[in-house]
Amino acid sequence: MSTALAKPQMRGLLARRLRFHIVGAFMVSLGFATFYKFAVAEKRKKAYADFYRNYDSMKDFEEMRKAGIFQSAK
């Protein structure tokens, strides 16, 4: 004679699944945020710093003025 199967625990099933998935989602989002910071944001920040280190705004302005972009600065 076989014994009866144990009944599955139904109480708190949703809360337990949500807790597990919320922790997983938090870990994935934290990992992606870290990846984005180092793969995209740091490179972009370095590119901006390199550009503005050698940028001459007056030279750029004079080139645009000579090209006739500005109507008020002849």
From Swiss-Prot:
Origin: domain of life: Eukaryota
Its biological purpose: Component of the cytochrome c oxidase, the last enzyme in the mitochondrial electron transport chain which drives oxidative phosphorylation. The respiratory chain contains 3 multisubunit complexes succinate dehydrogenase (complex II, CII), ubiquinol-cytochrome c oxidoreductase (cytochrome b-c1 complex, complex III, CIII) and cytochrome c oxidase (complex IV, CIV), that cooperate to transfer electrons derived from NADH and succinate to molecular oxygen, creating an electrochemical gradient over the inner membrane that drives transmembrane transport and the ATP synthase.
Record text on subunit structure and interactions: Component of the cytochrome c oxidase (complex IV, CIV), a multisubunit enzyme composed of 14 subunits. The complex is composed of a catalytic core of 3 subunits MT-CO1, MT-CO2 and MT-CO3, encoded in the mitochondrial DNA, and 11 supernumerary subunits COX4I1 (or COX4I2), COX5A, COX5B, COX6A2 (or COX6A1), COX6B1 (or COX6B2), COX6C, COX7A1 (or COX7A2), COX7B, COX7C, COX8B and NDUFA4, which are encoded in the nuclear genome.
Keyword flag Secreted: no
Species for this entry: Bos taurus (Bovine)
Major subcellular location class: mitochondrion
Alphabetized Pfam families for the sequence: COX6C
Alphabetical list of Gene3D superfamilies matching this protein: Mitochondrial cytochrome c oxidase subunit VIc/VIIs (4.10.93.10)
Protein name in UniProt: Cytochrome c oxidase subunit 6C
